[in-house]
Amino acid sequence: MSELTTIARPYAKAAFDFAIEQSAVEKWTEMLGFAAAVAEDETVKAYLSSSLSAQKLADTVISICGEQLDQYGQNLIRLMAENKRLSAIPAVFEEFKHHVEEHQAIAEVEVTSAQPLNATQIEKIAAAMEKRLARKVKLNCNVDNALIAGVIVRTEDFVIDGSSRGQLTRLANELQL
């Protein structure tokens, strides 16, 4: 996936800069999200990996997306097709979202807990992370029963492992020394 991310960065940056310039970030988020969903479809994936011409591939993706893509979105699809990069559309969307979140000063935080968190716990974690990161946060909560108890908090920059499993692993490592 890192190769696709590398490929996607310049397209996402260009699309984001254009969206900012045109005051159309929300529109571009919708367009790229729809195009990414189309490109992730198994039938479309197989079609995109065929040896058809770039023009034919671009026309097909644009046709499937229909009115979801404006002329600028269609131009992006054509450019990516010419460069044989249509398979990177989902990665472009992910990178684009990162630019939007950076622009809006929103940090994405993944919280994995042993049991589902209640609203109070979610609010406390969000408040603590907003204070630590000095920006708004968007929490993505997951449940992993293997943690035994506690939570693991992941951001782009760090991980806080407050799970019982993590504590047991650290204790086992210390005892082996």
UniProtKB/Swiss-Prot annotation:
PANTHER family of this UniProt entry?
Answer: ATP SYNTHASE DELTA CHAIN
Q: Which domain of life is it from?
A: Bacteria
Gene name tied to this protein: atpH
* Sorted UniProt keywords: ATP synthesis, Cell inner membrane, Cell membrane, CF(1), Hydrogen ion transport, Ion transport, Membrane, Transport
Upper lineage is: Bacteria, Pseudomonadati, Pseudomonadota, Gammaproteobacteria, Pasteurellales
Q: How is this protein positioned relative to the membrane?
A: Peripheral membrane protein
Q: Which GO terms describe its molecular function?
A: proton-transporting ATP synthase activity, rotational mechanism
UniProt subunit comment: F-type ATPases have 2 components, F(1) - the catalytic core - and F(0) - the membrane proton channel. F(1) has five subunits: alpha(3), beta(3), gamma(1), delta(1), epsilon(1). F(0) has three main subunits: a(1), b(2) and c(10-14). The alpha and beta chains form an alternating ring which encloses part of the gamma chain. F(1) is attached to F(0) by a central stalk formed by the gamma and epsilon chains, while a peripheral stalk is formed by the delta and b chains.
CC per GO annotation: plasma membrane; proton-transporting ATP synthase complex
UniProt KW Transcription keyword: no
Q: Which Pfam families match?
A: OSCP (PF00213)
- GO terms for biological process? proton motive force-driven ATP synthesis
UniProt xrefs under HAMAP family: ATP_synth_delta_bact
Spell out the InterPro entries in the cross-references: ATP_synth_OSCP/delta_N_sf, ATPase_OSCP/d_CS, ATPase_OSCP/dsu
Its main localization is membrane
Compartment(s) of residence: Cell inner membrane
Question: What's the name of the protein?
Answer: ATP synthase subunit delta
Organism (species):
Haemophilus influenzae (strain ATCC 51907 / DSM 11121 / KW20 / Rd)
Function recorded in the entry: F(1)F(0) ATP synthase produces ATP from ADP in the presence of a proton or sodium gradient. F-type ATPases consist of two structural domains, F(1) containing the extramembraneous catalytic core and F(0) containing the membrane proton channel, linked together by a central stalk and a peripheral stalk. During catalysis, ATP synthesis in the catalytic domain of F(1) is coupled via a rotary mechanism of the central stalk subunits to proton translocation.
Could you say which protein family the record assigns here? Belongs to the ATPase delta chain family.
